[in-house]
């Protein structure tokens, strides 16, 4: 089983709670650049927090969308053409499961992690997005 989640609108405490409720063992950061305006979600700080919760953190830059592509406004199309063919479901076997692919975008429908999820499902894996539907936005929880 694989999961995806975006952190936009979630505080770090709520984010970690969601991961733990779903027994996530490894968080796979699929941002090209693992930095955030919310420092709780920047690579080193996030990895340290997750380690304290018993969740492994890995940055998979190769599954991210470069900034110039995002700024051009065609990230999903670019991702389908350039990255989706390289996605192998077997990558999750390198990590303790279940795994969760993370990006910033709140809605999986507006994010490249949807393409990761589709590619994994096409290869026989089951998965779903964990972002809580109807959750109120919060800076810290």
Roles of regions detected by a PLM:
Residues 1-141:
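Residues lining hydrophobic/aromatic ligand-binding pockets adjacent to catalytic sites
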């Amino acid at each position: 089983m694989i999961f995806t989640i975006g952190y936009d609108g979630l505080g770090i405490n709520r984010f970690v709670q969601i991961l733990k409720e779903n027994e996530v063992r490894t968080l796979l950061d699929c941002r090209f650049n693992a930095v955030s305006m919310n420092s709780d979600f920047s690579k080193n700080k996030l990895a340290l927090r997750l380690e304290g919760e018993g969740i492994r953190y890995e940055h998979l830059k190769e599954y991210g969308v470069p900034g110039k592509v995002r700024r051009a406004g065609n990230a999903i199309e670019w991702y389908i053409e350039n990255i989706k063919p390289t996605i192998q479901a077997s990558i999750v076997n390198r990590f303790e499961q279940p795994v969760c692919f993370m990006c910033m975008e709140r809605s999986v429908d507006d994010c490249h992690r949807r393409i990761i999820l589709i590619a994994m499902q096409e290869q026989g894996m089951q998965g779903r997005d964990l972002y809580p539907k109807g959750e109120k936005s919060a800076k810290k929880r």
